[in-house]
């Protein structure tokens, strides 16, 4: 309340004529014919648009570089398909991972899968898309990387199990 009184007395002294302002002990401004508040504002002129970010290089050598986005994603995708396929064949026929790789049919399917998934992974990257930009709510780019890493470890574990025990992981 005291703050409001002191502010109103200060404001009153600024607009009250000189003779009545002397009781407040403050200097007053000359009385104006009309009491209006003038606010001057200036808008900023049209500014230049922000500079565009340089477009990411879409060279195949940049994408396939050691620290590029493609190698780990492609290998992870191949490992995910390979791990599930190896387990399905082990469960269906009883063939272990190493015996699957030794057969001519297994090598043909491996080569075909590598070619198709590599091209399917490279085409969007070469068009300038990123895995982070295509991420959804459940399956994001980070989850894909971790699933691929675990699938790679799973393939190594399947091979190690077959080498150590002499039998496939899933015995039918």
Curated annotation (Swiss-Prot):
Cysteine pairings via disulfide bonds: none
Pfam families assigned to the protein according to its UniProt record, in alphabetical order: Chloroa_b-bind
Annotated localization: Plastid, Chloroplast membrane
Record membrane topology: Multi-pass membrane protein
InterPro entries tied to this protein: Chloroa_b-bind (IPR022796)
Any single GO CC term annotated in Swiss-Prot or TrEMBL for this entry: chloroplast membrane
Transit sequence range: 1-38
Induction of synthesis: By light.
Alphabetically ordered keywords of this record: Chloroplast, Membrane, Plastid, Transit peptide, Transmembrane, Transmembrane helix
Transmembrane segments annotated in the record for this chain: 106-126, 150-170
Family per similarity comment: Belongs to the ELIP/psbS family.
The protein's role, per its UniProt record: Probably involved in the integration of pigments into the mature pigment-protein complexes.
Protein name: Low molecular mass early light-inducible protein HV90, chloroplastic
Organism: Hordeum vulgare (Barley)
């Amino acid at each position: 309340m005291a703050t409001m009184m002191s502010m109103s007395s200060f404001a009153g002294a600024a607009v009250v004529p000189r003779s009545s302002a002397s009781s407040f002990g403050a200097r007053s401004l000359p009385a104006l014919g009309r009491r209006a508040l003038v606010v001057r504002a200036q808008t900023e002129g049209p500014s230049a648009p922000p500079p565009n970010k340089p477009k990411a290089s879409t060279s195949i050598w940049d994408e396939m570089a050691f620290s590029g986005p493609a190698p780990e994603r492609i290998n992870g995708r191949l490992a995910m398909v390979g791990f599930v396929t190896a387990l399905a064949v082990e469960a269906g026929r009883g063939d272990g991972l190493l015996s699957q790789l030794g057969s001519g049919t297994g090598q043909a399917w491996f080569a075909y899968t590598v070619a198709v998934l590599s091209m399917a992974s490279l085409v969007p990257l070469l068009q300038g898309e990123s895995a982070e930009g295509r991420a959804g709510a459940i399956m994001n780019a980070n989850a894909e990387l971790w699933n691929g890493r675990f699938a790679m470890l799973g393939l190594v574990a399947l091979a190690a199990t077959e080498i150590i025990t002499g039998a496939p992981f899933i015995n039918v």
